[in-house]
């Protein structure tokens, strides 16, 4: 034993601040620090445990102490016969004894077996705890996988100082919050020996301001626990990341800090805690343990005003009123603030007062634009009171319903460190401001908050502009659909009966039913284009009112006796030339072949799109007709688009002109009706045929009298009872005929019922179809007998129509016998061809709609 003089250099006293609190917790430990130490002295009145020492006092005192220690040893062995702690002392190293008091209870908490302790703590040279194998059953009940709680080898945050950057790990019972196990790195990190933590409540070492946060974090984790059973054979390290939090843990004070308890400030070190819950199966049932891995935080700056080689960023989010809502845990080594300390504080207080003017402009642009790419360098305050320089990328979240700014998020890039590199030091009043500067800074902060709360954001303005534009587009669309209707004029009334939908497809009346949408170019994306049928119907009505039908009188006596298709009459050829443009671009081919007759082909070779310039006849097929219809639809849609491009004034002008034309046309029709009524009293040799299609253009060379076969006298037309072309019977000189009976009962009406929408008469019964020719559509014919009498009262030859086709003349001798007249209708798609026959020869014209 050495002298007492050297004992101060080789011994340390345990933390005196815990001398009283340790007595309560030590009583619950499975082992007692009151056990006699071999070769050591203890003092029960000092409040500290006895410390093994190499020095000794007089021989008398040592003998008395040995006797007392023997008595105490016997007492402890009777109280705790199952547990004994032996502490081996090394003279060259500082050995710390654990304070305790008498009367400790035994077997309250189980500790790990000595084998595992020696395996995981081989690097500890200070203290070795040995427990005799007196109760192997209880020791084997709890087996810890220490590989799960060993700290990492890298220090993720900041730079290591004098402490160990790897941190430490500990196991806590969730039953009473007592530390059951701690790694040996606890001593190098905080200065505490690991046995000082065992049996103590973990929350006693946590900073008072962080205890509520720690308790709430544990409670939240237990509400939805992530438990991995140790009895499972799977890897225990996967699929259980746990949760993290930042808190401050008390550091150990030794003799170097002095013996004064009241005048000494308690030091705390910030740690990043990672939680994991373990479910251990015991004899009493499942017990939940909490495994905590603590990694210390150190200041990220080493020198004053340090410029980091690698730019580091962290995120801060605050609300529109400046209240800080979130801060990254990665910001702790750079700012020094713990998230729970800075949350719910004014985020604008972090900015330097001299930079608030610039930040006011930044916030003004932020609420208008929605984001700011990257600001200039400005200053932000750290925990120690100094300022570091940062650059920030800003973004704002706008509530889509209220159009108000909800919160602002800033991603801050550190450019330069503060003047004091230790950001965890106590704050210093570095910046001293005058009252005027303080008032100005407060004014800037209030202005920034007012900007975030009151200024209307740009996304809201854009939304209003878009809504206004949509309303304008909708109004324009409605104006285009609902054009100004003409004023009601009694003379322009037109009674149109409901169309019989059995004669055409019902889908054609649907809006846009067969419209070529890909060919329709509309300014408004929401507008539904009109269908071709509707446009064609309107165009037919317009052409009906604007057209003046030109007719030719045919003298039956001038016809050769054997030429039913005599086409040399000049007035008839002129009327054929005045066929509407739709007829000129038809390109239809009709093949009419009778039994025992040569094939007769009628070709309308005027279509520029059908490639018929060679003059070769092409049969009327479905593909050619479909192609022709597509071209006509495109032309009609093009005309419709051109008319829509007119301004409102142009449309009004065109509407007025159309009404004026209708009035003039009606007047001419009425005048023509009066002329025809007067002419009925005089016998006439010629009569107008009714199976020719009217011309859409007025012929300059024809007299006015030939232009008034317009069915504008609606009362007269409604008295007609036929619906297909026929031959008129001229009035006799000896037997005059009234106006109501001057037409024969069999002729066909020359007005297209599909144009006027008039209901057609029921079709006549079909007698027999013609033989179907390859490449042709089936045709059906019905016999119609037309009797024509001359002025002498004897039957005369029928009145045949003349047609001029490629300057070819066909002649057929006329017989005195009465031949039946056949009407043939060919329809495909939107085209319809009507022919009348006498026998097997064609005797009629062509009708196209």
Curated annotation (Swiss-Prot):
Basic residues bias: start-end ranges: 706-720
Localization, UniProt: Nucleus
Record field: compositional bias (Low complexity): 14-27, 35-58, 735-746
A GO biological process held by the record: negative regulation of transcription by RNA polymerase II
UniProt cross-references to Gene3D superfamilies, sorted A to Z: PAS domain, Single helix bin
Domain of life per record: Eukaryota
Role noted for this protein: Involved in the generation of biological rhythms. The biological cycle depends on the rhythmic formation and nuclear localization of the tim-per complex. Light induces the degradation of tim, which promotes elimination of per. Nuclear activity of the heterodimer coordinatively regulates per and tim transcription negative feedback loop. Behaves as a negative element in circadian transcriptional loop. Does not appear to bind DNA, suggesting indirect transcriptional inhibition. Expression exhibits prominent circadian variation in adult heads and in particular in the photoreceptor nuclei.
Protein name: Period circadian protein
Source organism per UniProt: Antheraea pernyi
């Amino acid at each position: 034993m050495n002298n007492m003089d050297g004992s101060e250099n080789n011994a340390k006293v345990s933390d005196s601040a815990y001398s009283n609190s340790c007595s309560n917790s030590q009583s619950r430990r499975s082992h007692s620090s009151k056990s006699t130490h071999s070769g050591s002295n203890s003092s029960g009145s000092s409040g500290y445990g006895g410390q093994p020492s190499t020095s000794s006092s007089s021989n008398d005192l040592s003998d008395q102490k040995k006797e007392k220690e023997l008595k105490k040893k016997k007492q402890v062995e009777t109280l705790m016969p199952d547990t004994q702690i032996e502490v081996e002392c090394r003279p060259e190293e500082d050995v710390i004894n654990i304070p305790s008091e008498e009367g400790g209870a035994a077997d309250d908490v189980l500790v790990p077996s000595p084998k595992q302790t020696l395996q995981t703590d081989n690097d500890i040279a200070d203290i070795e705890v040995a427990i005799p194998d007196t109760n192997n059953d209880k020791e084997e009940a709890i087996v810890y996988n220490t590989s799960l709680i060993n700290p990492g080898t890298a220090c993720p945050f900041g730079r290591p100082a004098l402490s160990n950057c790897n941190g430490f790990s500990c196991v806590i019972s969730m039953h009473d919050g007592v530390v059951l196990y701690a790694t040996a790195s606890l001593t190098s990190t905080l200065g505490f020996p690991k046995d000082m933590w065992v049996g103590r409540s973990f929350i006693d070492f946590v900073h008072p301001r962080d205890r509520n946060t720690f308790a709430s974090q544990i409670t939240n984790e237990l509400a939805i626990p992530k438990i991995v059973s140790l009895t499972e054979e799977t890897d225990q390290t996967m699929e259980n990341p746990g949760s993290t939090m930042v808190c401050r843990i008390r550091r150990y004070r030794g003799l170097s800090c002095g013996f004064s308890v009241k005048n000494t400030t308690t030091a705390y070190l910030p740690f990043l805690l990672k939680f994991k819950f373990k479910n251990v199966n015991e004899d009493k049932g499942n017990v939940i343990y909490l495994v905590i891995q603590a990694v210390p935080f150190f200041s990220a700056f080493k020198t004053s005003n340090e410029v980091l080689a690698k730019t580091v960023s962290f995120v801060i989010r605050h609300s529109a009123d400046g209240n800080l809502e979130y801060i990254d845990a990665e910001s702790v080594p750079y700012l020094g603030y713990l998230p729970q300390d800075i949350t719910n504080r004014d985020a604008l207080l972090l900015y330097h007062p001299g930079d608030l003017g610039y930040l006011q402009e930044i916030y003004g642009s932020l609420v208008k634009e929605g984001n700011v790419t990257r600001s200039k360098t400005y200053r932000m305050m750290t925990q120690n009171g100094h300022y570091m320089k940062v650059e920030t990328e800003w973004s704002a979240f706008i509530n889509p319903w209220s159009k108000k700014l909800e919160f602002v998020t800033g991603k801050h890039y550190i450019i330069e460190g503060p003047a004091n590199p230790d950001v965890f030091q106590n704050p210093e009043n570095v910046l001293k401001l005058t009252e005027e500067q303080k008032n100005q800074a407060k004014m800037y902060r209030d202005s920034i908050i007012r900007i975030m709360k009151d200024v209307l954001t740009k996304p809201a303005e854009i939304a209003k502009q878009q809504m206004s534009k949509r309303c304008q587009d909708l109004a324009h669309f409605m104006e285009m659909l609902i054009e100004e209707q003409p004023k009601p004029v009694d003379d322009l009334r037109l009674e149109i009966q409901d169309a019989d939908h059995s004669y055409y497809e019902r889908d054609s009346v649907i809006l846009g039913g067969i419209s070529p949408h890909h060919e329709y170019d509309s300014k408004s994306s929401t507008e539904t284009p009109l269908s071709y049928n509707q446009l064609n119907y309107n165009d037919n009505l317009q052409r009906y009112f604007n057209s003046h039908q030109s007719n030719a009188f045919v003298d039956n006596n001038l016809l050769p006796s054997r030429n039913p298709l005599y086409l040399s009459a000049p007035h008839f050829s002129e009327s054929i030339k005045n066929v509407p443009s739709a007829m000129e671009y038809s390109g239809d081919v009709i093949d009419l072949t009778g039994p025992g007759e040569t094939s007769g082909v009628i070709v309308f070779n005027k279509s520029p799109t059908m490639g018929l310039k060679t003059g070769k006849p092409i049969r009327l097929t479905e593909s050619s007709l479909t192609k022709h219809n597509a071209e006509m639809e495109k032309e009609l849609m093009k005309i419709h688009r051109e008319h829509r491009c007119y301004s409102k004034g142009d449309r009004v002008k065109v509407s007025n002109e159309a009404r004026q034309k209708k009035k003039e046309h009606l007047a001419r029709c009425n005048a023509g009706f009066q002329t025809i009524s007067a002419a009925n009293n005089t016998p006439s040799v010629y009569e107008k045929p009714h199976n020719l299609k009217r011309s859409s253009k007025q012929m300059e060379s024809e007299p006015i009298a030939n232009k008034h076969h317009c069915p504008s006298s609606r009362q007269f037309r409604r008295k007609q009872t036929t619906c297909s072309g026929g031959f008129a019977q001229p009035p006799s000189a000896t037997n005059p005929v009234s106006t109501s009976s001057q037409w024969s009962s069999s002729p066909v009406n020359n007005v297209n019922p599909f144009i006027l929408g008039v209901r057609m008469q029921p079709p006549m019964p079909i007698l027999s179809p013609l033989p179907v020719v390859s490449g042709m559509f089936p045709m059906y014919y019905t016999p119609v007998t037309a009797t024509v009498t001359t002025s002498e009262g004897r039957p005369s030859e029928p009145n045949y129509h003349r047609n001029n086709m490629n300057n070819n003349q066909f002649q057929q001798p006329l017989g005195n016998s009465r031949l039946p007249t056949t009407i043939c209708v060919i329809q495909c798609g939107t085209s319809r061809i009507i022919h009348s026959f006498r026998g097997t020869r064609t005797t009629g014209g062509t009708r196209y709609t």
